[in-house]
Regions:
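Bacterial Sec-dependent N-terminal signal peptides
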Residues: 1-25
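A solvent-exposed, acidic/Ser-Thr-rich amphipathic alpha-helical stretch
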Residues: 23-30, 44-95, 108, 119-123
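A short, structured loop/turn motif at beta-sheet edges
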Residues: 94-103, 132-138
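A short hydrophobic beta-strand element
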Residues: 101-111, 125
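Beta-strand elements of well-folded, non-transmembrane domains
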Residues: 111-115, 131-133
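Short beta-strand edge/turn micro-motifs at domain boundaries
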Residues: 124-144
């Protein structure tokens, strides 16, 4: 009988888990991506990548280099190349965990940069970002 009540209690407890509106959360993530992009345009790439990073965020860059932690990410982008560059992107796909605590996006990006001679170069690619919901209900990336 104890087993029956334990199973019954467990089923009730698990069925009471709050349901999330995944479409609403996907819109939150899309809006976060656009706010991130806007901050990079208005306040600089270093500040944008710093502000939207979780404290333990990791970014993977050239030659499989990992930059770990938001301070190191800011330092990575705080140089003349990125100060003279701009970046645009938009998620083509967004998915959200069943409990609404994590999400990921991918899509196309375009970096535009000027060299010392003033010549402009463009770099295109595909990004993949993993987002984590914070205790204040904002989203920060943990992987980019």
């Amino acid at each position: 009988m104890k087993t029956f009540f334990l199973i019954l209690f467990s089923l009730i407890a698990f069925s009471c888990a709050p349901q999330i509106d995944k479409e609403k959360v996907k819109q939150e993530i899309f809006n976060t991506e656009k706010s991130f992009e806007k901050m990079c345009a208005e306040k600089g790439i270093a500040e944008g990548f710093y502000s939207f990073a979780d404290d333990s965020a990791v970014i993977k860059r050239q030659n499989d280099t990992l930059i770990i932690g938001k301070e190191n990410i800011r330092n990575y982008y705080d140089n003349d190349f990125y100060k003279n560059a701009s970046v645009k992107w938009a998620p083509d796909f967004i998915d959200v965990s069943n409990d609404g605590s994590m999400a990921y996006t991918y899509g196309k990006y375009l970096w535009t940069a000027k060299d010392a001679s003033g010549n402009t170069s463009e770099f295109r690619g595909v990004f993949h970002t993993v987002w984590k919901k914070q205790t204040d209900n904002n989203w920060k990336y943990v992987w980019d």
